[in-house]
């Protein structure tokens, strides 16, 4: 086992003895990372970690670092919903790129605790279809589902940014890329990190 990956006891329901499972050192510090495309596996890992850390200590904030091109909508919504319902506040920090579902997870952080690094990029757009060669009936059903998902995502951006519905809808019509300061102006993040010239740290 690599140094810095501690184990914690975990007892499954119905089992008498606990088994020891690995917990990453960064997770013990309540630091979580979304550094890839959002899919079911990544979503389940992050959801499980947030729930576990919330049970472990409901008073300490969580910090979610995001550098993601986006991914699947439903797994992304699972992460977003979990962030809203766990007891600790979830700080979201954009480093690199938060695009598509990555930007929705970014905006889902605790209001006043959403931050972007100065050279980060953010992109929002409407959900895309996976049925490029579907039968007509399947395409219609897919289109109906896409409209529902678009409505859901739009409402989230409206609620979390404070921007009017028409403005968010207009932005989502295309791939809308933003700098860190533009994302702050749009209400997607609350703060942009600035470099401390004396220490070369970001504050």
From Swiss-Prot:
Keywords: Chloroplast, Hydrolase, Plastid, Protease, Serine protease
Coiled coil feature spans: none
GO CC list: chloroplast stroma; endopeptidase Clp complex
Catalytic activity: Hydrolysis of proteins to small peptides in the presence of ATP and magnesium. alpha-casein is the usual test substrate. In the absence of ATP, only oligopeptides shorter than five residues are hydrolyzed (such as succinyl-Leu-Tyr-|-NHMec, and Leu-Tyr-Leu-|-Tyr-Trp, in which cleavage of the -Tyr-|-Leu- and -Tyr-|-Trp bonds also occurs)
Subcellular compartments: Plastid, Chloroplast stroma
PROSITE patterns documented for this protein: CLP_PROTEASE_HIS (PS00382), CLP_PROTEASE_SER (PS00381)
Group of enzyme by EC: hydrolase
Protein function: Cleaves peptides in various proteins in a process that requires ATP hydrolysis. Has a chymotrypsin-like activity. Plays a major role in the degradation of misfolded proteins.
PANTHER family in alphabetical order: ATP-DEPENDENT CLP PROTEASE PROTEOLYTIC SUBUNIT, CHLOROPLASTIC ATP-DEPENDENT CLP PROTEASE PROTEOLYTIC SUBUNIT 1
HAMAP family for the chain: ClpP
Full protein name: ATP-dependent Clp protease proteolytic subunit
Species the sequence originates in: Dioscorea elephantipes
């Amino acid at each position: 086992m690599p140094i810095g990956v501690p184990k914690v006891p975990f007892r499954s329901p119905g089992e008498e003895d606990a088994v020891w499972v690995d917990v990453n050192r960064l997770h013990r510090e309540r630091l979580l990372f979304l550094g890839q495309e959002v899919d079911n596996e990544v979503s389940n890992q992050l959801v499980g970690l947030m729930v576990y850390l919330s049970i472990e200590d409901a008073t300490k904030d969580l910090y979610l670092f995001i550098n993601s091109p986006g991914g699947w909508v439903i797994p992304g919504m699972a992460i977003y919903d979990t962030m809203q319902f766990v007891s600790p506040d979830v700080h979201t920090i954009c480093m690199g790129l938060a695009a598509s579902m990555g930007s929705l997870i970014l905006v889902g952080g605790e209001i006043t605790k959403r931050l972007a690094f100065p050279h980060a990029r953010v992109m929002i757009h409407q959900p895309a279809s996976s049925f490029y060669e579907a039968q007509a009936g399947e395409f219609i059903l897919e289109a109906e589902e896409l409209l529902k998902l678009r409505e859901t995502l739009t409402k989230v951006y409206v609620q979390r940014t404070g921007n009017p519905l028409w403005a968010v809808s207009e932005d989502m019509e295309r791939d809308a890329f933003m700098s860190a300061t533009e994302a702050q102006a749009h209400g997607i993040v609350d703060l942009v990190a600035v470099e401390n010239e004396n220490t070369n740290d970001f504050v």
